[in-house]
């Protein structure tokens, strides 16, 4: 058994003041740093995903001549239209400055194809193209993932569901997640779906206890 901690999209644009701010998104950073510190002590790999859109990305409402938050279709797939966010090379796409970035051993960038969105760290939304994440995890013999980040109901959820489908033992550090919640219960629904599909929902206390067993 070899574990890794996957930090999902802990970027400025998803935190308060950002272009697509998640309520209390910055509160996840302290949880992430505690988890990172524990992983370093236990010799557990720390990796991260980074939303990394070109400026002409098709999911941006301004590029689709639509309104933010409306549901439409992008190249045959359902698409929520988003504000411009996490554009490559901008401050909004950078990781939150309080995050312990020096501990991150590898970063997978996603959402780079302008014609399709990519919530999951493993695939685009159509499951047409894989990112490098699965290959990297296999090359490093990682079989168990703990996932936290932003947002619970989108990029965390779809990363978790893909991880399970690909055969990884997957747990979600719930107190390290916050949701967009276009509908008030979206995050709770996402957590239920993840659990129903086989994810283990955990909190920091349980995570630290479990992590001590791998030392």
Show the residue positions of the predicted features:
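Short catalytic helix/loop segments, enriched in acidic residues and glycine
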Residues: 22-37
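Active-site flanking residues adjacent to catalytic metal/cofactor-binding acidic residues
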Residues: 8, 50, 174
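Short glycine-enriched, charge-decorated loop/helix-capping segments at active-site entrances
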Residues: 18-25, 121-125
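Active-site alpha/beta core segments
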Residues: 33-144
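A short glycine-rich beta-strand->turn/loop micro-motif centered on a GG-aromatic cluster
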Residues: 146-149, 169-181
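Extreme N-terminal starter segment of soluble prokaryotic enzymes
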Residues: 1-5
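Short acidic-hydrophobic, aromatic-tinged amphipathic segments that line or gate anion-handling sites
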Residues: 198-210
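Histidine-anchored nucleotide/phosphate-binding helix
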Residues: 35-36, 156-167
């Amino acid at each position: 058994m070899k574990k890794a901690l996957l930090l999902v999209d802990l970027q400025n644009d998803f935190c308060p003041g950002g272009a697509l701010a998640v309520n209390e998104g910055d509160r996840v950073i302290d949880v992430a740093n505690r988890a990172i510190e524990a992983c370093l002590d236990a010799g557990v790999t720390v990796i991260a995903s980074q939303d990394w859109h070109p400026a002409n990305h098709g999911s941006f409402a301004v590029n689709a001549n639509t309104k933010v938050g409306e549901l439409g279709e992008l190249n045959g797939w359902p698409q929520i239209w988003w504000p411009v966010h996490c554009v490559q090379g901008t401050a909004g796409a950078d990781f939150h400055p309080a995050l312990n970035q020096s501990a991150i051993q590898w970063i997978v960038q996603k959402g780079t194809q302008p014609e399709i969105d990519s919530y999951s760290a493993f695939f685009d939304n159509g499951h047409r193209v894989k990112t490098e994440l699965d290959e990297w995890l296999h090359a490093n013999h990682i079989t168990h993932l703990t996932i936290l980040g932003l947002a619970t109901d989108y990029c965390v959820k779809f990363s978790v569901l893909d991880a399970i489908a690909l055969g990884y033992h997957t747990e979600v550090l719930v107190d390290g997640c916050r949701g967009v919640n276009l509908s008030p219960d979206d995050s709770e629904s996402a957590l239920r779906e993840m659990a129903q599909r086989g994810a283990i929902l955990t909190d920091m206390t349980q995570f630290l206890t479990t992590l001590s067993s791998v030392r």
